[in-house]
């Protein structure tokens, strides 16, 4: 028997002799190895099912009759209460769904939806991206492998050094989105973390064949792309089928398989960075270049865009296209280096492989964390609810009109987790009768002791984060240890702050409507109480929202703010800290404001400048208006700036890039009930043979003519030229000349993007179109 230590990378199972065998993909200094456990059976729980039913339980498929392998009586615990039930074992994981459906007719079936290999990770206390020790017999085979006799987790600070391969495909389409049925792949650009940059081009058959060979020879642990799950991999599969090339890049020689529309590569992680970008709410347009720009990693080495590929390739200027492909691969690689470390840590915390973690929303991540913690204390998980109820949200104080100087924003750090801990809010503490905490307004009661399931986990997460932050103070921010610990504390913060939303999520196993409702009720109470305390100390509360308040007072100093915070700490059981000092700030309405921090940064929250469905010119003018008001305190100049832009549109002095509007296609155009402008633009493109896949950003412009806005929306892929006035548009009948709808851009883009801001300073729509002038003095607080 040998002992081998390494990192756990992935977990799945293989059917050997009719039995499901857990397969662990691990890595040590020698490389990849596989460990097999033959001694683990799929199982789930049932409550309220008679033993006779279990003895005779049978269901069937077309191929076989499915029966239980065995069952055993067990004392189970659910929401802290003891109940009698059974542990039910199946012959194979594929039998579990049928058995679950059959037995759910007779009682309560629990935890029958946990994938077999992930059940193994929970039961054995193992975690992907963490250390693992295996004792067992070494077996033969191409890949070093072991038969598990004993397995255990070895906690490690660092992450494994994964071999990464990033790739991006470029296709040749005469216009619009390429179609795999007819448009060939002309380039696959690759970058690895060994600093290799490889461009595969030439004959398509050779490109695909060389790409498969490259994956096999480089043997990456993780393959990364941007939107490759929905686009590159399906496209590659179609084109490979055309040439009879197997995509057999799995470490066991298997082909890429698609499960639920997701590519799975055996023994390799497959991460789509687009999934991560979709959860970053501050990135409104999810294009690769926008994400890179947001993260500060963007490099620009190409002088063409995607829409130019056909033109340059077909006239022989292939180097420009190759440079563009290289740029995409490098940007994808740099985004991966920025975003993946936190997901490595999340993988370690919730046990699952990184590629699964990147595809999950926060609620599902919390769900898996809770499943692991429940196992440790002998709890079985509830089932998600059949439906969820709504509840009143956070209390919002109406914002004060005008421009304000010398303002402090006080942040109620992790307010909702703090409330949950302070009042022991948890599904297993709800429904208390004696010695309870009672939520204001809603009256829900929670027992004071013992600690509930959520409170114990939240305390653990917060305490771990507190310990890490203490360690960080003693380290250099440039050290590798600091960076690792910082990733860990950020990950803990993300999970901690996700608990509140999880309680009201309709797919949560531990869904608890009263818990979520009570938490927001206490939150509203604390915001109101904080405002009253601040006012009693001479502060003016300008705005309050969810977990922060904005305060000011004549001659306010930081010492004044510190005294206020001390007083709030005396009265309230939550941590409060200064989020930002603003030298100037204005509020447009609830959840919408812009401020200039004391160190000169512009902070914009909830305004259209950060939205994706406005043209570039509207976003630019709004940002300039905000800057002029905050930095120069001159709304008249801001007004003049808007008038200049309106004049420029009228005189035809705008570029195509300035007037294009982008909006995402969230489903097939035929599935939309209401035909929005971007949908009709996509349909016009389809008439010309351009098919936009779901998740594409449709760029379109609005032209003059009859009909509604959608009737006059044309995709930029059909536009050949634009001179500021006239657009040359490809149609079935040839090139048509259409005029830009200047009135639409003035009335529905430019003016709406700034009007709500300028209205706060006394201006009207007529002011923007006319010559009204105002002074700022009457609006300055």
Curated annotation (Swiss-Prot):
Keyword Nucleotidyltransferase in annotation: yes
Keywords from the named record: DNA replication, DNA-binding, DNA-directed DNA polymerase, Nucleotidyltransferase, Transferase
Catalysed transformations (reactions): DNA(n) + a 2'-deoxyribonucleoside 5'-triphosphate = DNA(n+1) + diphosphate
Pfam families linked: DNA_pol_B, DNA_pol_B_exo1
Biological process (GO), any one: DNA-templated DNA replication
EC number(s) stated in the UniProt entry for this protein: 2.7.7.7
Keyword Transferase in annotation: yes
Domain of life: Archaea
InterPro entries: DNA-dir_DNA_pol_B, DNA-dir_DNA_pol_B_CS, DNA-dir_DNA_pol_B_exonuc, DNA-dir_DNA_pol_B_multi_dom, DNA/RNA_pol_sf, DNA_pol_B_thumb, DNA_pol_palm_dom_sf, DNA_pol_type-B
An example Gene Ontology molecular-function term: DNA-directed DNA polymerase activity
Enzyme category, top tier: transferase
Record-linked PANTHER family: DNA POLYMERASE CATALYTIC SUBUNIT (PTHR10322), DNA POLYMERASE DELTA CATALYTIC SUBUNIT (PTHR10322:SF23)
Family: Belongs to the DNA polymerase type-B family.
Identification of the protein by name: DNA polymerase
Protein species of origin: Archaeoglobus fulgidus (strain ATCC 49558 / DSM 4304 / JCM 9628 / NBRC 100126 / VC-16)
Gene: pol
């Amino acid at each position: 028997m040998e002992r081998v230590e390494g990192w756990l990378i992935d977990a799945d199972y293989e059917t050997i002799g009719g039995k499901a065998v857990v397969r662990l993909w691990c890595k040590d200094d020698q490389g990849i190895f596989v460990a097999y456990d033959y001694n683990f059976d799929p199982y789930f729980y049932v409550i309220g099912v008679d033993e006779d039913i279990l003895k005779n339980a049978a269901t069937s498929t077309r191929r076989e009759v499915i029966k239980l392998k065995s069952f055993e009586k067990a004392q189970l615990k659910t929401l802290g209460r003891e109940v009698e039930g059974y542990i039910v074992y199946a012959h194979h994981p594929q039998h579990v769904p049928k058995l679950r459906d059959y037995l759910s007719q007779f009682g309560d079936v629990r935890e029958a939806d946990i994938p077999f290999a992930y059940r193994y990770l929970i039961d054995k206390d193992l975690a992907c991206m963490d250390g693992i020790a295996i004792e067992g017999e070494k077996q033969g085979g191409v890949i070093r492998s072991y038969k598990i006799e004993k397995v255990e987790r070895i906690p490690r600070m660092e992450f494994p050094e994964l071999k990464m391969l990033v790739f991006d495909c470029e296709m040749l389409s005469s216009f619009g989105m390429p179609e795999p049925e007819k448009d060939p792949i002309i380039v696959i650009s690759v970058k690895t973390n060994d600093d290799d940059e490889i461009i595969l081009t030439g004959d398509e058959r050779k490109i695909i064949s060389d790409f498969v060979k490259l994956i096999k020879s480089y043997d990456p642990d993780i393959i990364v792309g941007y939107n490759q799950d929905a686009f590159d991999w399906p496209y590659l599969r179609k084109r490979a089928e055309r040439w009879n090339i197997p995509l057999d890049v799995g470490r066991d020689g298997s082909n890429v398989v698609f499960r639920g529309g997701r590519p799975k590569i055996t023994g390799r992680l497959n991460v789509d960075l687009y999934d991560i970008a979709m959860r970053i709410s501050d990135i409104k347009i999810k294009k690769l270049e926008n994400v890179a720009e947001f993260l500060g990693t963007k490099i620009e080495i190409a002088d063409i865009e995607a829409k130019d590929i056909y033109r340059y390739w077909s006239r022989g200027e292939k180097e420009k296209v190759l440079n563009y492909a290289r740029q995409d691969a490098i940007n994808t690689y740099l985004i991966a280096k920025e975003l993946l470390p936190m997901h490595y840590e999340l993988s370690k915390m919730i046990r699952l492989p990184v590629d699964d973690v990147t595809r999950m929303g926060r609620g599902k991540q919390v769900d898996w964390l809770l499943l692991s913690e429940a196992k440790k204390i002998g709890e079985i998980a509830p089932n998600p609810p059949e439906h969820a109820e709504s509840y009143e949200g956070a209390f919002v104080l109406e914002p004060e009109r005008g421009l304000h100087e010398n303002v402090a924003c006080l942040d109620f750090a992790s307010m909702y987790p703090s409330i949950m801990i302070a009042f022991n809010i948890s599904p297993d503490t709800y429904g208390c009768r004696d010695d309870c905490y009672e939520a204001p307004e809603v009256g829900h009661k929670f027992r004071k002791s013992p600690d509930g399931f959520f409170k114990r986990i939240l305390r653990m997460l917060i305490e771990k984060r507190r310990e890490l932050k203490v360690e960080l103070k003693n380290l250099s921010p440039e050290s590798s240890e600091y960076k690792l610990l910082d990733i860990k504390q950020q990950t803990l913060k993300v999970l901690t702050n996700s608990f509140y939303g999880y309680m009201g999520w309709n797919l949560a196993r531990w869904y608890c409507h009263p818990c979520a409702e009570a938490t927001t009720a206490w939150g509203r109470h604390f915001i109101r109480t904080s405002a009253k305390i601040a006012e009693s100390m001479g502060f003016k509360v300008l705005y309050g929202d969810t977990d922060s308040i904005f305060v000011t007072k004549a001659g306010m100093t930081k010492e004044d703010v510190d005294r206020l915070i001390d007083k709030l700490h005396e009265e309230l059981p939550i941590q409060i800290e200064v989020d930002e000092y603003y030298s100037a700030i204005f509020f447009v309405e609830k959840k919408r404001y812009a401020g200039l921090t004391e160190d000169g940064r512009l902070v914009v929250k909830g305004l259209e400048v950060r939205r994706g469905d406005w043209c570039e010119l509207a976003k630019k003018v709004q940002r300039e208006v905000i800057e002029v008001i905050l930095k120069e305190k001159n709304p008249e100049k801001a007004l003049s700036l808007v008038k200049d832009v309106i004049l420029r549109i009228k005189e035809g002095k705008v570029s195509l890039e300035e007037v294009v509007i982008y909006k995402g296609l969230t489903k097939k155009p035929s599935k939309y009930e209401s035909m929005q402008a971007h949908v009709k633009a996509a349909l016009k493109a389809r008439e010309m043979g351009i098919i936009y896949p779901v998740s594409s950003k449709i760029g379109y412009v609005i032209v003059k003519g009859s009909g509604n806005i959608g009737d006059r929306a044309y995709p930029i892929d059909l536009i050949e030229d634009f001179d500021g006035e006239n657009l040359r548009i490809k149609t079935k009948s040839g090139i048509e000349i259409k005029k830009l709808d200047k009135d639409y851009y003035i009335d529905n883009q430019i003016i709406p993007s700034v009007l709500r801001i300028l209205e706060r300073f006394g201006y009207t729509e007529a002011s923007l179109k006319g010559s009204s002038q105002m002074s700022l003095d009457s609006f300055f607080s």
